[in-house]
Amino acid sequence: MRRAREAEMMKSQVLFPFLLSLFCGAISQQIRYTIPEELANGSRVGNLAKDLGLSVRELPTRKLRVSAEDYFNVSLESGDLLVNGRIDREKICGRKLECALEFETVTENPMNVFHVVVVIQDINDNAPRFVAKGIDLEICESALPGVKFSLDSAQDADVEGNSLKLYTINPNQYFSLSTKESPDGSKYPELLLEKPLDREHQSSHRLILTAMDGGDPPLSGTTHIWIRVTDANDNAPVFSQEVYRVSLQENVPWGTSVLRVMATDQDEGINAEITYAFLNSPISTSLFNLNPNTGDITTNGTLDFEETSRYVLSVEAKDGGVHTAHCNVQIEIVDENDNAPEVTFVSFSNQIPEDSDLGTVIALIKVRDKDSGQNGMVTCYIQEEVPFKLESTSKNYYKLVIAGALNREQTADYNVTIIATDKGKPALSSRTSITLHISDINDNAPVFHQASYVVHVSENNPPGASIAQVSASDPDLGPNGRVSYSILASDLEPRELLSYVSVSPQSGVVFAQRAFDHEQLRAFELTLQARDQGSPALSANVSLRVLVGDLNDNAPRVLYPALGPDGSALFDMVPRAAEPGYLVTKVVAVDADSGHNAWLSYHVLQASEPGLFSLGLRTGEVRTARALGDRDAARQRLLVAVRDGGQPPLSATATLHLIFADSLQEVLPDLSDRPEPSDPQTELQFYLVVALALISVLFLLAVILAIALRLRRSSSLDTEGCFQTGLCSKSGPGVPPNHSEGTLPYSYNLCVASHSAKTEFNFLNLTPEMAPPQDLLCDDPSMVVCASNEDHKIAYDPSLSSHQAPPNTDWRFSQAQRPGTSGSQNGDDTGTWPNNQFDTEMLQAMILASASEAADGSSTLGGGAGTMGLSARYGPQFTLQHVPDYRQNVYIPGSNATLTNAAGKRDGKAPAGGNGNKKKSGKKEKK
């Protein structure tokens, strides 16, 4: 009943398109889908309406339908082709390698017929299965070891990789199993006797036979082997031929006789009765029948040449005993013309270097048509416009070669469709698409995203911090496009470079290896290289400039006032008659920072007389705010704080000791008048010092008197000369001894410890090499002359002044060239903003120029108008090489002038020396 219904269905599938062809001119096109078997009902195969070029809105009017309604139907809402029934590949196609359902699709208004092919792919849904639940064997006990027994093979409805692969049995001492392959490729088990049997010892054996397929995961089936040991039968059946051969058309009807096999047995009785059976039962029983008594073989199904061109059947003849014989039957199937060409890639390389030459072979292609004659002659061509072409090498062989230039950066992949067409009527064709990947070569150098890089880094950065990142790109792939970074060059020393910066080879991040110091290094430049990993490698360079920003990490440092060589504080003398605004001294401080961080301000923290002195906010100049009163103490103390402009500000303090006196003699009693405990040794030292001072004063007075008389008689001198003794009086503000050597040839410092029971005088005498040929002190007749302790003879040669060389004009500066300082500003204490570009060498040059002017006699001690007015303490010994930017802080101790001498102008006084008032006080003391 079922067979009749299937036959009727197949008949309708044949008649339906035939009848439709009466109304349609021809099938317009063929649509092909591929699905796995056993899809659930309602599963989507594809959008049939879209593939037919129909819109969803047209479906109701076009009445789209298919002929294979048992398996598929069409959704009129979406146009999808849906599964309508169980699709079992094994049931539909059996053991055919390629299984497809072909049916027609019909549309109306207008009527069209389309041919649809749905390829059914096999899945591993069938486990190997033995037909019989058990296998019975009778083996004579006389069988010798090495005898083989062919067993019934298992059936596996799946094909190719999911089909049957091997057999196994449980371990035992008498038998082993091997898997054999028949000429048609099917596998069957063969039992091998390993050890002689003994019926009296064991009359039967039970084994478990397992068949496994090649699926993933593999499926298996088992059966039992019952072996009964019998008595000996000494003759086995013998076939008339070992191999039977026959040819058969592929479309013969069922039941067609193929041939008869025959075997004979010389035994008699039951041992001579022969029965025939197939060994490879899955193929045999599906397509062929074997009469067990006569040996006649007939067809039992449809033979297809394209599925199998040759069948090999294994036939077993068994007598009434235990002996068997085997033969093979080879059936050749005659072909008919019903196959399209097939394209096979014999050799194929889908990775093509982009620099490949024209004519390079990419693939070797073999075309095959299972048909013969004209229907089997095939031609191939490429459908797309691609830089490739096909060249015929021999019959049925083509090679795919490069026909144009390749550039991976423009096109990385090509899809090439090869169409093969036979010469049949009508012609059949097939197409195969391949994807060709263009492999990269290193033909592009890295490119930085910027032409150059500039980064700003604050000083005192943490070591190891990232300060910049450079980035370069390379359009190549893999190692050819993998960029690594390195430092190629720098304006730093090679040894210093490793301790300053490093760069990450992978990310291009530049790291600081140490904390930067703006005062030591303000900027540096690196040359970074980006290099790919190709062979040969390509690279690119870029410059990275690192600017180190300043932080307020240096507190101001007070240069003046400073402690004496023995640690004692220095004193500055102020005339008792000093008027308000008189320049007493100047606090000189420096700050190693720059910019706003080096802009210094001066503040009075503590004063013994708060209203007696004023302090310039930016200049550091200490001036008298009012005249000295009767109730004011002669000794004054100022505690000054110097702050910079940083955030937060840093500061330093300095203590000024000021004494109101008109001469040195007035200072000594005041200095020594302290309620200290009496010490005989100290008092003795004090008297010795006082005696020495008195002797020196008397000697100096005599020398000054002699020189004054001599100067009156000398009219050739432009200025009044000074004596060439080893000491001269300086009653102005004292400076540290290490700053006393300079352009002035005669100076001494009075250093008295303010908190000591001793009164000490420290004299700094000139060496003969430093003695100038002319007195550099200005024409002040009231100058107090001090006698030298080393030489009581005054050796003065007037001719020296006439041979004094004029100063080099290269060292002179015009008023515009001289740098402005805080003292050159107007009366407000706002100061000037420090210039960060101030050059230390220019300051040194100005100091030397001042020294040259002083030696020439054209400059006063305090500095006249248009001169620099630098004190001797800022001579070559104190060059301020450590001060990069302190113009506002340059002050000439003992003078009321700064670099531009504008302070004197602001006070409305002549630009005379800072010691002028003090010298007049000395003159009064002399009188």
Curated annotation (Swiss-Prot):
Keyword flag Transmembrane: yes
GO BP, sorted A to Z: cell adhesion; homophilic cell adhesion via plasma membrane adhesion molecules; nervous system development
PROSITE patterns: CADHERIN_1, CADHERIN_2
Start-end of Polar residues biased regions: 799-836
Principal subcellular localisation of the protein: membrane
Residue ranges that the UniProt entry lists as topological domain Extracellular: 29-687
Compositionally biased region (Basic residues): 917-927
SUPFAM superfamilies: Cadherin-like (SSF49313)
Annotated Cadherin domain residues: 29-130, 131-239, 240-343, 344-448, 449-558, 566-671
Glycan-carrying positions: N41, N73, N300, N415, N541
Signal sequence, start to end: 1-28
Region annotated Disordered, chain positions: 797-836, 897-927
GO molecular function, one term: calcium ion binding
GO cellular component, one term: plasma membrane
UniProt keyword list: Calcium, Cell adhesion, Cell membrane, Glycoprotein, Membrane, Repeat, Signal, Transmembrane, Transmembrane helix
Cytoplasmic side: 709-927
Topology term for the membrane: Single-pass type I membrane protein
Protein name: Protocadherin gamma-B1
